[in-house]
């Protein structure tokens, strides 16, 4: 994105707006190895931030440039401003030139609260195609597909109070938001923490395949309906390198189930392939939702109010179909189903422990292909251990089903 999400598309109003998010900056060329110099505008060389850095506008790290952020640094950012990385950012990782961050010495990006708007005043996202009036809209960190992946690392980084940046992910007006955006970018992010994010913590698209390890994530908190899953991925991880979410914890809000409840999944994937291992999803309405997606969910604990793991259809790419593997998990929805496989999903569920489901079944299968082996299902308070309907192809062997309604 220069910043246009679909470079082959002609510029529309939304694309022009997105460019304005990043490019309407006063450009200054810092000296080589500058320290805490560029508070807004463009970094074109190498700059190091340490201690406290107070930004006063949008920042662009240009292609070929490098921003180094040392351990313990606090970056204060105005409410609706963002950082766009087209070159590289090395935050808290000694392998790329920064001092090593840790739990006791993290790097903190803190966005301020917006000023109270005057009558009829709107924020920078109130343009045709987006129409979001929030005064904080547009804040976050954007990692472009042009980044130097060999020099880019994020370690023990906290994003606090970002609203999220709106992005047209397909050039057709499909606007999604993210506080930390991976636009075709694939890099390692270790021990990230997200706090008070209005929309979505992480948005990955355009073939992005980041590895997120040891993270603390929260479902969006926006009260005007813009809140989203903690992680959203569209067309991510479908190449030779898959997207990974490892050793991470997710929390949110336990709203009522159903379309009127307003709840969001902790993880939402569409047309993506993602490896998820050793996750904890608790205190939220829904767990993970995979639409036309595949991958792995293993060695995890999913405790939700509504459905824990939803799948709809499967990922198909390059003439191949891909299975979603759900294995060795403890799955405990209070009211909803443990696992659903709907409308062409291809699922292998093995060695899971599923219980709860006061208003659902352990596995709900409709018009899908499911292999379920060596699972322990029950007690189930709602309906059945396995509820199969439609023209489904199901193989279930060596399961233990007990105490169903």
Task: List where the protein language model places each region.
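Beta-strand/loop edge motif enriched in small/polar residues
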Residues: 29-405
